[in-house]
């Protein structure tokens, strides 16, 4: 893989996420690619074309609590109680992806319905086409250090239009610190983690695993490390629940 990202460069928000080993959007092999007539997808040029439903695609690159899959025992941040021995449904997400913003609330609801049945988790996959996806993922990691991963994730999804186009490092950093303050976080600690060189490691780990299992875009739903076809941001909560149970062999 490529060398670790410089933390200051990350916060500029202008370095391609390809530095994480990611590649451009628009894989023709993915169901959620720009060639799929039934979905809205974002092309490699960064422009979105809309039709019936939605996900942003990329060529292969790779309250919630941390938990630890086949790569190193890590399965992502948990959206429900851990069920030892049960299957795991995972959402690969990009906080700048508008389709992830639509998918994640339904994923959260599905997690509630699957509590005690399946493990439901989320992992990072910042796309090359979204210049501030990596800084946003860093903000989520910095919030998780104080137990507020989900709160920061939801804040970023709700305010995408406010930060997605910011290119000045200091302005983006200040805004994310403002969000941390709104969420009741210790901003000094938040900023320290935001700038720490190690904070990118879980993002890199998630992307590496996404590459390994064939994730091609966001949002992508995976059950037991197998990409689930037929689901995207337009899928209902009931569709998510029934599909996850079927793929996991749960009646």
Each model region followed by its residue ranges:
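Structural alpha/beta surface segment adjacent to cysteine/selenocysteine redox centers
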Residues: 90-96, 101-175
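Short clusters of hydrophobic/aromatic residues that line enzyme substrate/ligand-binding pockets
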Residues: 79-81, 163, 228
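Internal amphipathic alpha-helical segments of the cytochrome P450 catalytic fold
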Residues: 22, 149-153, 187
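Extracytoplasmic thiol/disulfide redox context detector
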Residues: 2-129, 243-251
């Amino acid at each position: 893989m490529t060398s670790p990202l410089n933390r200051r460069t990350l916060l500029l928000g202008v370095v391609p996420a390809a530095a994480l080993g990611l590649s451009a959007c628009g894989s023709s092999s993915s169901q959620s690619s720009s060639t799929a007539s039934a979905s809205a997808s974002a092309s490699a040029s960064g422009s979105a074309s809309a039709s019936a439903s939605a996900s942003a695609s990329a060529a292969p690159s790779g309250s919630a609590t941390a938990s630890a899959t086949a790569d190193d025992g890590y399965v992502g941040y948990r959206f429900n109680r851990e069920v030892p021995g049960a299957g795991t449904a995972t959402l690969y997400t990009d906080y700048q992806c508008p389709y992830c913003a639509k998918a994640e609330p339904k994923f959260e609801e599905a997690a509630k319905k699957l509590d005690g049945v399946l493990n439901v988790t989320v992992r990072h996959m910042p796309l090359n086409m979204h210049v501030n996806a990596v800084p946003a993922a860093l903000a989520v990691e910095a919030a998780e250090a104080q137990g507020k991963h989900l709160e920061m994730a939801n804040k970023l999804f709700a305010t995408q239009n406010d930060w997605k186009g910011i290119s000045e490092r200091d302005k983006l950093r200040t805004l994310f610190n403002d969000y941390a303050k709104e969420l009741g976080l210790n901003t000094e600690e938040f900023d320290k983690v935001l700038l720490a060189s190690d904070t990118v490691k879980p993002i890199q780990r998630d992307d590496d695993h996404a590459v390994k299992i064939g994730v091609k875009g966001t949002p992508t739903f995976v059950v037991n490390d197998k990409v689930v076809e037929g689901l995207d941001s337009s899928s209902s909560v009931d569709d998510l629940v029934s599909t996850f149970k079927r793929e996991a062999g749960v009646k």
